[in-house]
């Protein structure tokens, strides 16, 4: 895969990055070099190798899931000017 000047313009527009006409050609070359490095990574044989989440061995601590209200209801509704039965009361905005 290679990047052309139109692709650079399109990507810069989508990313909302201002790029001047004199910067398009060098950017095209730079992106093609980067893609070349990525294509080299595709040549590496990784069959039989487990994916890593970290270079340090980690064990997941398991716990039983339990549903709670967070014990913060009083703190949360304390910020509202008007509440009813632990719900915020607001004026009707749609008729």
Swiss-Prot record:
GO terms for biological process: glutaminyl-tRNAGln biosynthesis via transamidation; regulation of translational fidelity; translation. Its EC number is 6.3.5.-. It catalyses: L-glutamyl-tRNA(Gln) + L-glutamine + ATP + H2O = L-glutaminyl-tRNA(Gln) + L-glutamate + ADP + phosphate + H(+); L-aspartyl-tRNA(Asn) + L-glutamine + ATP + H2O = L-asparaginyl-tRNA(Asn) + L-glutamate + ADP + phosphate + 2 H(+). The keyword Glycoprotein does not apply. It is an enzyme of class 6 (ligase). Keywords: ATP-binding, Ligase, Nucleotide-binding, Protein biosynthesis. Gene3D superfamilies: Glu-tRNAGln amidotransferase C subunit, N-terminal domain. SUPFAM superfamilies: Glu-tRNAGln amidotransferase C subunit. One of its GO terms (molecular function) is ATP binding. Heterotrimer of A, B and C subunits. Allows the formation of correctly charged Asn-tRNA(Asn) or Gln-tRNA(Gln) through the transamidation of misacylated Asp-tRNA(Asn) or Glu-tRNA(Gln) in organisms which lack either or both of asparaginyl-tRNA or glutaminyl-tRNA synthetases. The reaction takes place in the presence of glutamine and ATP through an activated phospho-Asp-tRNA(Asn) or phospho-Glu-tRNA(Gln). Belongs to the GatC family. This is Aspartyl/glutamyl-tRNA(Asn/Gln) amidotransferase subunit C. It comes from Bartonella quintana (strain Toulouse) (Rochalimaea quintana). The gene is gatC.
